């Protein structure tokens, strides 16, 4: 168990280090997924502010989605974060997948955000 956590921590640190090197002052789209929900937020690291956030726990999302833990929900949340980001004046972001592989729900969220108008 401890070995798995070490590998996850190393992967997360490696991804963040690469992001900071390539960000050029752009905000980052950070993703967190649990077994039942998915969350994302757009963070401006220079100012230390969250510019926009969306999750499958929100009332509007819960009413329209069957569950918060599938690919359809992730795509819908991606579109929602893109709408909120454009309303906040953000169009270019850096995608921060954290320690998660770019597959399944994480990939669906990214594709939904791209469909919604975010560039990364």
UniProtKB/Swiss-Prot annotation:
Keywords: Ribonucleoprotein, Ribosomal protein, RNA-binding, rRNA-binding. SUPFAM superfamilies: Translational machinery components. Signal peptide: none annotated. Pfam families: Ribosomal_L18p. One of its GO terms (biological process) is translation. The keyword Chaperone does not apply. InterPro entries: Ribosomal_uL18_bac-type (IPR004389), Ribosomal_uL18_bac/euk (IPR005484). One of its GO terms (cellular component) is cytosolic large ribosomal subunit. Disulfide bonds: none annotated. It comes from the Bacteria. One of its GO terms (molecular function) is 5S rRNA binding. Belongs to the universal ribosomal protein uL18 family. HAMAP family: Ribosomal_uL18_B. Part of the 50S ribosomal subunit; part of the 5S rRNA/L5/L18/L25 subcomplex. Contacts the 5S and 23S rRNAs. This is one of the proteins that bind and probably mediate the attachment of the 5S RNA into the large ribosomal subunit, where it forms part of the central protuberance. This is Large ribosomal subunit protein uL18. It comes from Methylocella silvestris (strain DSM 15510 / CIP 108128 / LMG 27833 / NCIMB 13906 / BL2).
